Regions:
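N-terminal amphipathic, basic helical "cap/leader" segment at the start of enzyme domains
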Residues: 1-92, 186
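C-terminal helix-cap and adjacent tail motif
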Residues: 6-9, 85-86, 159-186
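Short, hinge-like loop/turn segments at secondary-structure boundaries
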Residues: 65-66, 150-153
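Short, well-ordered beta-strand micro-motif
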Residues: 49-51, 100, 164
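Short, surface-exposed beta-edge/turn micro-motifs
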Residues: 44-45, 95-98, 159-160
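Small-aliphatic-rich amphipathic alpha-helix that forms the alpha element of a beta-alpha
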Residues: 33, 99, 104-149
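Arginine/glycine-rich "motif VI" loop of SF2 helicases in the C-terminal RecA-like domain
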Residues: 126-127, 154-156
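A generic structural signal for short coil/turn motifs at secondary-structure boundaries
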Residues: 16, 107-111, 172
């Protein structure tokens, strides 16, 4: 699959088979991620791979509780509050692996650089027949001292992109895209 095909085929996947993702496949995704450009070539990222399902279940519970305790009435939609309150909802969708991309240090564009690495990772996963989903629900709690400690992250690391990876149960259907506003100047 060429890069343009991966761009147009990549979709968020939230339903996975139980088949584990092999170490070499996960390493290949990380190898592609670190090919991303970065400001001043600082490459300010680190990667944490988690396949321990009881740990992912615990992080899911902690992240949901954290989000609910910090949710603002009128700001956090009721639909999201209800989802987070559901004991059966696991924020990682029982995926076989989580790859967390964290920014190392306080470089001015470290977060943006990690986002570029994340897109490389997700496109490479698509090209390899794997599915991914960026789990925004996990970000805030993973950035707390307790969240960092759960994964052995140093205090200087900032969790940016928690991405689940697995073998999709079914092919992701195409999704309509909005027409972008484009301004041509000159």
């Amino acid at each position: 699959m060429d890069i343009e095909e991966a761009i147009y085929r990549r979709r968020t996947v939230r339903e996975f088979t139980a088949k584990p993702v092999e170490d070499n496949a996960l390493q290949r995704l990380i190898d592609a991620a670190i090919q991303a450009p970065s400001a001043m070539n600082q490459q300010p990222w680190s990667f944490t791979v988690v396949r321990d399902q009881p740990l992912l279940d615990r992080i899911s519970r902690e992240a949901k509780a954290h989000l609910l305790s910090t949710a603002s009435a009128g700001v956090t939609p009721l639909q999201i509050q209800n989802l987070l309150s559901n004991a059966d909802f696991q924020i990682f969708y029982h995926a076989p692996a989580l790859i967390l991309i964290s920014a190392v240090g306080a470089d001015a564009w470290a977060v943006e650089d990690c986002c570029l690495a994340a897109e490389n990772l997700m496109l490479t996963a698509c090209a390899a027949g794997l599915g991914t989903c960026w789990i925004g629900f996990a970000q805030n709690w993973l950035g707390t001292p307790e969240g960092k400690a759960s994964l052995g992250l140093p205090a200087t690391h900032l969790p940016v992109a928690p991405i689940i990876v697995g073998h999709p149960k079914t092919p992701a259907p195409p999704v309509a895209r909005k027409v972008s506003e484009v301004r041509w100047v000159g």
